[in-house]
From Swiss-Prot:
It is found in: Cytoplasm. The keyword Magnesium applies. CDD domains: PheRS_alpha_core. This is Phenylalanine--tRNA ligase alpha subunit. Tetramer of two alpha and two beta subunits. It catalyses: tRNA(Phe) + L-phenylalanine + ATP = L-phenylalanyl-tRNA(Phe) + AMP + diphosphate + H(+). It comes from Geobacillus thermodenitrificans (strain NG80-2). Its cofactor is Mg(2+). The gene is pheS. GO terms for biological process: phenylalanyl-tRNA aminoacylation. Keywords: Aminoacyl-tRNA synthetase, ATP-binding, Cytoplasm, Ligase, Magnesium, Metal-binding, Nucleotide-binding, Protein biosynthesis.
Length: 344
C-alpha cells in the first residue's frame, strides 16, 4: 500500500508539472483528489488493512494528498501569472508613439460676430434684452405700428401657430416689451439679439431662420444726429477706423423718418470694387427715429420722449467681413467651412 501511495504521488506531481494551462491542471486535480480518485479509494479501503497498519497508511495518505494539493496550488499560481503576462504583452501600448492631437473647439464665425457687436454696444452703455421666439401678434406687429391688414402680417411671410401666436419675424417685440416695463419713464438703451423666422425659400442670401440684432434708445431730446453718431462709431469699431456712413431715405412702419445705412467700402476704400458693386458703399442696416405711435402704445409721451432704433443681420455682416458668399454655410456645420475660421 505504501508503494502504491508513493507511486500515485510521483505520477500526480509529474502530471502537475506537465499541465500547460488551468484546464489541464484542474483535470489533474479531479483525477487524483476527486471523489473517485485513487487517493480517495485508498482511504476508503483502510478497513481491509490490519489494525496496526491503519494509522501509518492513513498518515501517509494524508501526506501524499497534502503534497499533491500544495503542488497544485503552486502550479496554479504560476499558470495564472503566466496568463497575466501574456495578456499584458498582447495589450501592450507603445508609449513611444506620438499621441493623437486633440481637436479643439472654436467659436462659430456667426457667434463671433454677434459677440463682437454685443461687446461694442455694451461698451457704449447698452444692455442686452432677450425675449421669446414664439411671440404674440400684438407684440410682433400691432405694438410696432403694424395694424391688422398690414402686408407684413401676410400668412405667406410669417410662420403662424394660431391666429394670435407666431414665430417672431424680428427682435423688435423686445423693444415694445422693454418700453412697457419702463412705464413711460426713460432712459431706455438696449440691444436685442436673437433668432427670427420668415417664410423665405432658402438660397444663397435668404434663410427661413436667421439672426437679428436691433437697438433702441429712448430718452428726452434724442435726435437723428445721435443715431448717426452712434452708428458711425459702431461702423468704425467693427470695420476699422476711417470708415464713414451715409443715410438713404427708406420706410419702416415703426420709425419715422426711416433710413437705410451704408458704410464706406472697407475693401476698396470707397473707390469701387465687386464687394460694393462699384459704388464705394455697402448697405449694412436699417434705422430711424422711433415712430410716435410706437412710443404712445408703450406708455411714453411722444411729446416729451423721442428715440431711435436700428436693426441689422449678423449673417450679412459676417458675410461681408469674411467674404462668405452663401448664408447657408452658417447652418450646415461643415467642418471644411468652419475650420477656415480657427484663427480669425
Amino acid at each position: 500500500m505504501k508503494e502504491r501511495l508513493h507511486e500515485l504521488e510521483r505520477e500526480a506531481l509529474e502530471k502537475i508539472e506537465q499541465a500547460g494551462d488551468l484546464k489541464a491542471l484542474n483535470d489533474v486535480r479531479v483525477a487524483y483528489l476527486g471523489k473517485k480518485g485513487p487517493i480517495t479509494e485508498v482511504l476508503r479501503g483502510m478497513g481491509a488493512l490490519p489494525p496496526e497498519e491503519r494509522p501509518k497508511i492513513g498518515a501517509l495518505a494524508n501526506e501524499v494528498r497534502e503534497a499533491i494539493q500544495k503542488a497544485l496550488e503552486a502550479k496554479q499560481t504560476k499558470l495564472e501569472e503566466e496568463e497575466v503576462e501574456r495578456k499584458l504583452a498582447a495589450e501592450a501600448i507603445d508609449v513611444t508613439l506620438p499621441g493623437r492631437p486633440v481637436k479643439l473647439g472654436n467659436p462659430h464665425p456667426l457667434t463671433r460676430v454677434i459677440e463682437e457687436i454685443e461687446d461694442l454696444f455694451i461698451g457704449m452703455g447698452y444692455t442686452v434684452a432677450e425675449g421669446p421666439e414664439v411671440e404674440t401678434d400684438y407684440y410682433n406687429f400691432e405694438a410696432l405700428n403694424l395694424p391688422k391688414g398690414h402686408p407684413a402680417r401676410d400668412m405667406q411671410d410669417s410662420f403662424y401657430i394660431t391666429e394670435e401666436i407666431l414665430l417672431r419675424t424680428h427682435t423688435s417685440p423686445m423693444q415694445a416689451r422693454t418700453m412697457e416695463k419702463h412705464r413711460g419713464r426713460g432712459p431706455v438703451k438696449i440691444i436685442c439679439p436673437g433668432k427670427v423666422y420668415r417664410r423665405d425659400t432658402d438660397d444663397a442670401t435668404h434663410s427661413h431662420q436667421f439672426t437679428q440684432i436691433e437697438g433702441l434708445v429712448v430718452d428726452r431730446n434724442i435726435r437723428m444726429s445721435d443715431l448717426k453718431g452712434t452708428l458711425r462709431e459702431f461702423a468704425r469699431k467693427l470695420f476699422g477706423e476711417g470708415r464713414d456712413i451715409r443715410f438713404r431715405p427708406s420706410f419702416f412702419p415703426f420709425t419715422e423718418p426711416s433710413v437705410e445705412v451704408d458704410v464706406s467700402c472697407f475693401r476698396c476704400e470707397g473707390h469701387g470694387c465687386s464687394v460694393c458693386k462699384g459704388t464705394g458703399w455697402i448697405e449694412i442696416l436699417g434705422a430711424g427715429m422711433v415712430h410716435p405711435n410706437v412710443l404712445e402704445m408703450a406708455g411714453f409721451d411722444s411729446k416729451t420722449y423721442t428715440g431711435f432704433a436700428f436693426g441689422m443681420g449678423p449673417e450679412r455682416i459676417a458675410m461681408l467681413k469674411y467674404g462668405i458668399d452663401d448664408i447657408r454655410h452658417f447652418y450646415q456645420n461643415d467642418l471644411r467651412f468652419l475650420q477656415q475660421f480657427l484663427r480669425v
